A protein has these predicted regions:
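Primarily the internal scaffold of c-type cytochrome electron-transfer domains
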Residues: 1-6, 10-12, 17-20, 24-32, ...
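A gly/proline- and charged-residue-enriched helix-loop-helix capping module
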Residues: 27-30, 40-47, 54
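Alpha-helical solenoid scaffolds in eukaryotic proteins
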Residues: 347-353, 385-392
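Conserved hydrophobic register position within alpha-solenoid helical repeats
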Residues: 367, 405-406
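Residue-level signature of the C-terminal ends
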Residues: 374-377, 412-416
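Short coil/turn segments at helix-helix junctions and helix-capping linkers
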Residues: 395-401
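Alpha-helical linker/edge segments of TPR/alpha-solenoid repeat scaffolds
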Residues: 413-424, 453
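Eukaryotic intrinsically disordered, low-complexity regulatory tails and linkers enriched
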Residues: 453-491
């Protein structure tokens, strides 16, 4: 800081509320333990300020001496406030200052006959589909300024998009094939997407939305499911659109006989719309989120794109061929078996477990989190193999994968009643290998003894013997296929 303003820096650390401890961002943003300690130190004025505040003016100031740039930054509101979505509100405030004007505005009707039309402000429910979605897309989409001129404007007076408009002309949305501006690594953006172009990191919800057939139909938008003024703040889903109702408000015929469409029991997770059509395949900050690309599962497409498949994420003991054959039998001959995985791993082993051991960091994070989900497609007592494989994730080179593995292991242990909770809770995912490795060996020994005493034999082919010892001769070749590249989350 100085006379020309101040530079605010984000430290490469965060306070993790769930664990009640400081966590290095390498262990959050999908990087290995030995990566650059200061990589995630960032200038708040040129990065964080845009999506976490309202009325942003970074105020970039030239130094004239070629030194570090200076900022004189201002925001109208710290955090996301009314004008982020409703636009500049001076005219609205002045209009509603008069009781008579408020009464008249409340009675005014729009073209659809709805009251409250004369608001002098942007209402997401009263603008077109593209304009409504753009209100969310201004932040919930990774993007670049549309031109170099726009870039310098953004860094001085702020983004040029205003609610009520569209994003085109203001920003360019990132896609898998978007060129990376120098000096960035050429594959930076490509690593943020699955091989078929589906986003696999958070903050791409708008991109997924616009790729969805529902959106291309012209009616579907963010407000079809979400509301900012009601419901649970965690997901901001409209109370009357929870569960399947978000989908059946349009797909009413399916709702009349869910099992006929899903071929699963109506009360099971296999009959929940989002489990198949918006699977949890997106990595966020130590959480796995639902894809916002609404589409149908396709085993061949997903496997060949290196993308977790909704069917085998739930049926974790099944291989890709089984899933493809079931889809062809139940939903049509156009479904085929996969040709090959991008990593060259075998197709004749359980697809989810192969991704856990051979996949890249995002695949491993998504898969190990899925193993611990309560709605997995098998009885609780049959999930000992899932816990065994999740324990392997505790030895991962990426802290984020280890944390998710411990979370899943705790859930699986609670379902199986093996009594490992104390040891799992004490396992420090941030400790060095000299501490973690012996602790993991002790955990595996305790697990094996408890599982042999209390559980039925595991399914064949799940990398666990009948004695609940890991089949390391099968797992080690898969571990050798792992790709350890940096996944630039872009936050």
């Amino acid at each position: 800081d100085g006379p020309g303003g101040a530079i605010y820096r984000r430290l490469p650390l965060l306070w993790h509320i769930g664990d009640a401890r400081w966590t290095h961002l390498n262990g959050v943003f999908l990087e290995a333990d030995d990566d650059d300690w200061s990589r995630h130190q960032a200038v708040w004025n040129a990065n964080c300020v845009f999506c976490h505040n309202t009325g942003v003016a970074p105020g970039l100031k030239p130094t004239g001496d070629g030194g570090e740039k200076r900022f004189d930054s201002h925001v109208s509101d710290v955090g996301i406030a009314c004008e982020s979505c409703h636009g500049p509100a001076r005219a609205h405030v002045e209009l509603y200052a008069s009781p008579v004007a408020r009464y008249r505005a409340a009675l005014a009707r729009d073209a659809g006959g709805r009251r409250g039309a004369a608001q002098a402000i942007v209402d997401p429910l009263r603008v077109g589909q593209a304009e409504s979605a753009a209100l969310c897309g201004q932040c919930h989409a990774q993007r670049l300024p549309a031109s170099e001129e726009k870039l310098w404007t953004f860094l001085d007076t702020g983004p040029t998009f205003r609610p009520g408009g569209v994003l085109a002309g203001h920003v360019t949305l990132l896609a898998r094939d978007t060129p990376v501006p120098p000096p960035g690594a050429p594959d930076t953006f490509r690593q943020r997407f699955w091989g078929d172009g589906t986003a696999r990191l958070t903050a791409y919800e708008y991109v997924g939305l616009t790729q969805s057939p529902c959106f291309r139909g012209g009616a579907f938008s963010c407000t079809s499911c979400h509301t900012m003024h009601a419901g649970d703040v965690a997901g901001q889903l409209a109370p009357d659109r929870l569960g399947d109702r978000a989908c059946t408000q349009c797909h009413a015929a399916i709702a009349r006989d869910v099992a006929a469409h899903t071929h699963h029991r109506p009360e099971s997770s296999g009959s929940r719309c989002v489990e198949c059509h918006m699977p949890e395949i997106v990595y966020g900050v130590l959480e796995i989120h639902r894809s916002h690309r609404v589409e149908s599962p396709d085993v061949a497409r997903d496997v060949e794109a290196g993308r977790p498949n909704a069917c085998t994420a739930c049926h974790a003991d099944r291989d890709a061929a089984w899933a493809a054959d079931r889809m062809r039998d139940l939903w049509g001959a156009h479904y085929r078996r996969a040709g090959a995985r991008p990593d060259g791993a075998p197709l004749d082993a359980p697809e989810a477990l192969v991704s856990l051991h051979a996949g890249d960091p995002v695949q491993r994070a998504v898969t190990v989190a899925a193993l611990g989900r309560a709605e997995a497609g098998m009885p609780a007592g049959a999930r000992g193999f899932a816990l065994a494989n999740a324990l392997v994730g505790l030895g991962d080179a990426y802290g984020a994968v280890r944390l998710l593995a411990r979370r899943s292991a705790l859930r699986l242990d609670a379902a199986l009643g093996l009594g490992l909770a104390g040891d799992l809770a004490a396992y420090d995912v941030q400790a060095g290998r000299d501490v973690r490795d012996p602790a993991l060996q002790a955990l595996l020994q305790r697990f094996g003894a408890a599982a042999r005493a209390r559980l039925p034999p595991p399914p064949a082919g799940t990398f666990v013997g009948r004695d609940y010892q890991l089949e390391l001769d099968r797992i080690r070749p898969l571990l050798g296929l792992q790709r350890g590249h940096v996944i630039s989350v872009g936050e």
